[in-house]
């Protein structure tokens, strides 16, 4: 499919169910067989930290194909002083419109809107090989940690103007709504959508069978049961395993692509 003409606009109440349905489609490939992001979107709109001025949809071919939703979050420094920042997510794009720049368009548009609204920075949890393409850096570079004091490649920050995070260090907190989802609620909410077969994750064996003995041992040492688990880890993280040379990493990228994932920093296009 050729890249579509995309129109960006604010989400309207009459869009809500369609956006939840596209979010369900975008995130259905979950190791547990179903996703909860559509219920999260439903609940996010009802919390005080939701920012309707940054709740944008992307339209193409006469329908909604993408959505980005923002909430206010905070950084708490060691002295207890808090600094307001943004977080976004889910960022959803219909599968058939992924890798066409829809997600990137939504991000760049809303980054500028957020800057004009006076927000200083955006802090997210996301794929560490994708989001640096639009300016995100590891949060640890800014002296930020998660609420429990950890840091990792998938925890990233983007200052919205020069010096926006200067002198600000500490722990990052998001709204409790992100932790409010349990399987019972998700499956009950899911009844309001068309029936959908549970997703079956891809066993790691499909990759192991393509690798030589040394690389196979290295991947086994990562402790992954499913290939899907690589989608949450950076190329830098995976390639650091002893025994995975560039030839092996090329095989990893190829196998990921064969199963529908554009994974790794060398991929030319993503969402």
Q: Could you say what each language-model-derived stretch is?
A:
Residues 88, 93, 99-112, 123-124:
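Conserved acetyl-CoA-binding loop-helix of GNAT-fold acetyltransferases
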Residues 116-120, 125-150:
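Conserved active-site alpha-helix within GNAT-family acetyltransferase domains
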Residues 162-199:
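Acidic/histidine-enriched, glycine/proline-rich intrinsically disordered or flexible terminal extensions
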Residues 200-271:
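Compact, charge-rich alpha-helical regulatory domains located at protein termini
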């Amino acid at each position: 499919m050729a890249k579509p003409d995309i129109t960006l606009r604010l989400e309207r109440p009459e869009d809500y169910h369609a956006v939840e349905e596209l979010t369900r489609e975008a995130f259905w490939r979950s190791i547990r067989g179903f996703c909860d992001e559509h219920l999260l979107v439903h609940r996010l709109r009802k919390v005080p930290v939701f920012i309707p001025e940054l709740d944008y949809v992307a339209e193409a071919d006469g329908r909604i194909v993408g959505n980005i939703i923002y909430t206010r979050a905070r950084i708490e420094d060691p002295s207890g002083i808090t600094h307001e920042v943004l977080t976004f997510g889910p960022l959803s794009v219909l599968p058939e419109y992924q890798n066409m720049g829809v997600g990137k368009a939504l991000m760049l548009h809303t980054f500028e809107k957020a800057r004009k609204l006076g927000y200083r920075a955006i802090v997210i949890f996301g794929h560490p090989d994708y989001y640096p393409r639009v300016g995100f850096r590891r949060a640890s570079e800014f002296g930020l940690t998660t609420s429990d004091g950890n840091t990792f490649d998938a925890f990233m920050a983007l200052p919205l103007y020069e010096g926006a995070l200067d002198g600000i260090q500490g722990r990052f907190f998001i709204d409790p709504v992100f932790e409010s989802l349990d399987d019972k609620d998700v499956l009950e909410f899911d009844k309001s959508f068309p029936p959908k077969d549970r997703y079956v994750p891809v066993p790691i064996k499909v990759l192991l069978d393509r690798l030589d003995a040394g690389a196979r041992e290295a991947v086994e040492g990562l402790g992954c049961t499913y290939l899907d688990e690589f989608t949450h880890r950076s190329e830098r993280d995976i390639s650091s395993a002893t025994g995975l040379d560039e030839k092996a990493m090329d095989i990893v990228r190829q196998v990921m692509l064969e199963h529908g994932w554009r994974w790794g920093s060398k991929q030319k296009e993503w969402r």
